[in-house]
Curated annotation (Swiss-Prot):
Subunit structure: Homopentamer. In the absence of Mg(2+), interactions between subunits are weakened, and dimers, trimers and tetramers can be observed in vitro.
Source organism phylogeny: Bacteria, Pseudomonadati, Campylobacterota, Epsilonproteobacteria, Campylobacterales
Gene: corA
Keywords: Cell inner membrane, Cell membrane, Cobalt, Ion transport, Magnesium, Membrane, Nickel, Transmembrane, Transmembrane helix, Transport
Catalyzed reaction equations: Mg(2+)(in) = Mg(2+)(out); Co(2+)(in) = Co(2+)(out); Ni(2+)(in) = Ni(2+)(out)
InterPro entries: CorA_cytoplasmic_dom, CorA_MIT, CorA_TM1_TM2, Mg/Co-transport_prot_CorA, MgTranspt_CorA/ZnTranspt_ZntB
Any one GO molecular-function label of the UniProt entry: magnesium ion transmembrane transporter activity
One GO cellular component, as annotated: plasma membrane
Protein name from the UniProt record: Magnesium transport protein CorA
Compartment(s): Cell inner membrane
The organism's place on the tree of life at top rank: Bacteria
Amino acid sequence: MVNVFFKQQKFVIKKRFNDFNGFDIEENEVLWFELINPTPNELATLSQEYAIHYNTDHSQRVSSVTKYWEDSSSVTINAFFTNQDENETFHTEMATFILSNNILFTIYYGTLEIFDSIQKKVLASPKKFEDGFDILTKIFEVYFEKGVECLEWINKQTSLLRKNIIFKETSTHDDILVRLSNLQEFNVTLRDSFFDKRRIITALLRSNKVDSDTKNNLNIILTDFSSLVESTTVNLNSLDNIQNLFASQVNVEQNKIIKLFTVATMAMMPPTLIGTIYGMNFKFMPELEWQYGYLFALIVMAISTILPVIYFKKKGWL
């Protein structure tokens, strides 16, 4: 599927095509070609009509993530975007950006929510978009905003997880470990994605194909992404602290269990010793012939069990 955005007077118009059938828009009017899950025919038409080369080998595309290169007529960028899903999971998709003759070509497979937001902004504010570089800059701006939202969500979940551990709420240890691992993975993935955008923007700033106004905007966005990278570092430290807190709590609980069994073992040693003595079956043991010998032995065993427990409590070991 191909979405085409083109200027018409003071407006930006969006049209959808399949395999470019019925495409009759002048090239100088086009701002953006958005190819979503493109077919081989669509890619072939793109290559033939606009001299755009796109690597159809998925494994090579993945290995080219975050790479930037340009030739005399075009700029090609491979970048990955992290998208948070509704059920608090996330996924990462790669997108290819090609800038040629001031037209932006985006090619991606799967779903990326950020492009829905970009479409709305382009259609709502047509005066802000004169060429493909303006749209690419807006994509970085919107991704920055999405990144801020994701980091705020991570920060909120981190705070809730800390309270859950400290106040020992209903979550099991397995649940806490899963939540902690997911937050760490999400944060690291976002961090890598922000680094990715910084490298791309830095490369664009060195290009002579980018005009001065666009470079000024990119400089601001570069600073914004640097601040996001710092925020991910803060989140990583907070999550590491929570992990240490959780490990300490588990150790305390294990120590309590070990202490309980140790006290129980120590408390049972005296009565065990008494029972062992009376179980020696020596021929001359006065208590064996005594009428109350059995009751006496039970009382002594009970007292020898209770006394260590009282002693441990006074020492604060229980």
